[in-house]
């Protein structure tokens, strides 16, 4: 949400001023973050951790990832949920890889207004952040999750066939609202599905999958865009819609059961 409200409008203005400025400032942001990390006193790192943490830190990165992947594979509901989110992440990345070109060249929006358009979509995320708990309580977590995964998927397709920027903006608002609902409630599901003492390792392995496929999706999206800037959104939208339909019942059941804190063994029986 902050990315869309502040980052996107600022990047649009910078892009309009000089095409290299967004990239320069983005790199500068990483540099500043690295400086702050090095400014953390060493004694806080070496003496501020617990014995359990110290033991965990001795394990290699590969062994941690291996443990997480094994856990994900052996837990059927968690495995299917990760497979669903990974495939969605891949096609979302594919569909949005050339979004700025679609907006500026097909919808004919000036580059300096690109961020304003994204901020409008971000307002849907803000509204969802306020309403998601109420919607979940009123309609049930499973219902909201299932509807959110479908709406956030099919809106990708609708964006690809948008005739003008106004329609695109409205669809973007709806999409951001649905995606934020999905993300908030999805994290609640993970907190039930993954034991607290293992959450870091399992969640890290999950993110390795989800974020690992996104650059590949973006690359393929760029290739597809050579056939037309609408194509990535249309292809990605069709794929995400089919994935959401295939996962609709699973997500509905999973959401309702995790809202009761239930995982073993009923979730495995219904997966």
Over which residues does each language-model region extend?
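Amphipathic alpha-helical recognition patches that constitute DNA-binding helices
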Residues: 1, 9, 60, 77, ...
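Hydrophobic alpha-helical transmembrane segments
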Residues: 1-48, 119, 123, 220-223, ...
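Transmembrane alpha-helix boundary/hinge residues in polytopic small-molecule transporters
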Residues: 9, 81, 98, 184-185
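Residues at helix-coil transition
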Residues: 16, 40, 70-74, 92
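Phosphate-coordinating loops and pocket residues in cytosolic domains that bind phosphorylated ligands
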Residues: 24, 83-84, 204
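Juxtamembrane interface at the ends
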Residues: 37-55, 180-194
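Juxtamembrane intracellular "pre-TM" segments in multi-pass secondary transporters
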Residues: 43-83, 267-271
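C-terminal transmembrane bundle of multi-pass solute transporters/carriers
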Residues: 66, 73, 87, 92-93, ...
């Amino acid at each position: 949400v902050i990315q869309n409200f502040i980052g996107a409008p600022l990047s649009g203005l910078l892009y309009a001023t000089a095409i290299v400025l967004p990239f320069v400032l983005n790199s500068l942001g990483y540099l500043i973050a690295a400086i702050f990390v090095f400014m953390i006193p060493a004694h806080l790192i070496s003496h501020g951790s617990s014995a359990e943490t110290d033991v965990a830190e001795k394990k290699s990165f590969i062994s941690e990832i291996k443990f997480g992947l094994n856990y994900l594979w052996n837990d059927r509901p968690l495995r299917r949920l990760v497979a669903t989110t990974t495939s969605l992440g891949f096609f979302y990345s594919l569909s949005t890889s050339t979004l700025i070109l679609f907006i500026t060249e097909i919808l004919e929006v000036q580059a300096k207004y690109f961020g304003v358009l994204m901020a409008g979509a971000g307002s849907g995320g803000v509204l969802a952040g306020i309403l998601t708990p109420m919607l979940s309580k009123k309609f049930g977590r499973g219902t909201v999750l299932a509807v959110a995964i479908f709406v956030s998927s099919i809106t990708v397709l609708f964006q690809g066939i948008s005739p003008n920027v106004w329609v695109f903006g409205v669809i973007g608002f709806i999409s951001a609202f649905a995606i934020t609902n999905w993300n908030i409630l999805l994290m609640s599901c993970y907190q039930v599905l993954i034991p607290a003492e293992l959450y870091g390792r399992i969640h890290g392995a999950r993110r390795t999958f989800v974020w690992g496929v996104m650059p590949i999706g973006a690359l393929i999206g760029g290739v597809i865009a050579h056939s037309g800037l609408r194509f990535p959104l249309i292809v990605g939208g069709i794929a995400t819609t089919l994935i959401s339909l295939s996962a609709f019942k699973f997500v509905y059941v999973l959401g309702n059961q995790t809202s009761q804190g239930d995982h073993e063994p009923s979730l495995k029986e219904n997966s």
